[in-house]
Amino acid sequence: MSAYSLSAGQGPAQAHPIESGCMDLPHMGVIRVLGADAVSFLQGQLTQDVALLGQDRAALAAYCNAKGRVQASFIALKRSAEEVLLICSRDSVAPMVKRLSMFVLRAKAKLSDATEEFRMIGLCGSAADALKPGATPWSRMDDGAAMVVFLYPGAGVSRACWLAPAGTPPPTGPELPLAYWHWLSVRSGIAMVGPATFEAFVPQMLNYESVGGVSFKKGCYPGQEVVARSQFRGTIKRRAYLVHAQAPVAVGQEVFDLSDPEQACGLVAAAAPCPDGQGYDAIVSMQTSVAAQGGQLRAAGAQGPSLTLLPLPYPLLEDI
């Protein structure tokens, strides 16, 4: 383990960003899918090719309705040939266990809420780099009893998710406030879908296909035809963009362009206050035509906070 110390309940009081450390992630939960058919069952439910997951790789995945709208998104990792863990918003665990269980039928797979069986910690900066220098996003390693998934960086800061059975000695590092993790997650440009944005987007509206969250080579899953058609026919009209605002913005707020203030052109998918106290950063799923024009953007109405576009930290895949 790296040579830092984590002291529970003693977060720093600094308002400025600290680029290395650890924090518990109590807002995240874990769904366990267990059984001989766990992988094949999920293969028919998620946008990800679960069969390709291995001991060295995790992946972003989404569960969609029949119209291709994302109900929840996950970080999927295979713990064994018969056990897959899905990391998601804690508020999504119960409804997703219930929803997915409806389709198990005769498959040898059982879904359960395993949140209390694990501890999840976010690692930032050198606390993440020390475990595997140069790790690429979605790569995975085992660290004793723990599983570590390396995520997309945020604001140039490396990130990783450490997951281990409850009671496992945690990684060590300066403890950071959870708000810093939320901000880094926003700056990564990847918005996770939970109850607040349930069925608000198809995967491409969040750039999931550009960050490895959609497989176009696997078999069917709910909404697959819509997702594939959007990609192959070039009908992607909305993308996720990073923006900055000087005033608070919130998930679920509509976004408007002052050239057409009566018609929303986007929706806030994720938002967090900047650690330096200078406003908010957010991920907005927005019409590509409006983003290309660089219009005068506002959140929550024409009189709402002004939004300034920021560069995405990853390239977008062109329409196939």
Indicate where each model-derived feature is located.
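Acidic, proline/glycine-enriched N-terminal capping motif
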Residues: 1-60, 64-71, 80-81
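Short amphipathic beta-strand starts and helix->beta connectors
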Residues: 12-18, 61-73, 104-107, 141-149, ...
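Acidic, low-complexity central loop/insert segments
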Residues: 19-23, 27-30, 75-188
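Short, conserved charged micro-motifs
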Residues: 37-42, 93-97, 127-132, 166-173, ...
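A common structural junction motif
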Residues: 49-50, 101-109, 172-181, 259-264, ...
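Short, conserved active-site entrance elements at the starts or edges of catalytic domains
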Residues: 178, 183-210
